[in-house]
Amino acid sequence: ASAQEFLAQSIIGEDIFSHLVQNTPAFKKTLDEFESPSKQNNIFVLQAEEGLEKSAWARALYLSKYSDMGEFLKIDFNRKGFVENEENDAFLKELENENNSVVYIENLNKLSEGEKSNIRHRIMIYAKKSTAKIFIGISEKEEADFMDEDGLTEITIPPLRSSLKEVPQILDETVKFFVERDGHDYRRFSLAAQNMLTKYQWPGNLRQLVDLVQVLLSRRDKEIVNVD
């Protein structure tokens, strides 16, 4: 198969972030390190800075280890118009679906203390009778309320600045993804641009890098991306 054919096959069912997590050596190493605790426990707290796309890590884990066991379910409590009783009933119905192999939950901090307590209780009950893996995404600034419970494993996702040497490869992998998915012309970064970006601290993490690539790909005037 050609490189283009391989790329097309590799991005099926993936978003850009879960694709990068699975195909960048630095991220993949972290992903592989999750395997041992994942065999022992069912509930994980994913702790990361903003812009690291915690849901992508949960989805990457699903695609690499659990996709043949069931479905991936994402539950987001950041929806407007939250109605406690109705939403809780819907949450429980989704959570207890036997087809799930991975459940990712985020924005629990948007709930009241009473809502969080009730949902935490339901999650703990569900985890004892289900084989599905549950991932709860939090930011570093949030209080990890769930860490008070037994049987939880904390997973810290490293920021992009801890993998600065990998930035040129991450940039190229991001370009290839959007070239294949969206039909952009291939672009490459000059050595000067790569060197500059490996010194940048990326406060917006992976999302900032992806946004940068998308902006550059939308400009069709240059084949090579220089420092300017």
Task: Walk through the language-model features, giving the residues of each.
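As written
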Residues: 151-152
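Short, flexible helix-to-coil linker/hinge segments that flank and couple to helix-turn-helix
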Residues: 172, 222-228
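AAA+ ATPase active-site-proximal loops
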Residues: 5-146, 159-164, 179-223
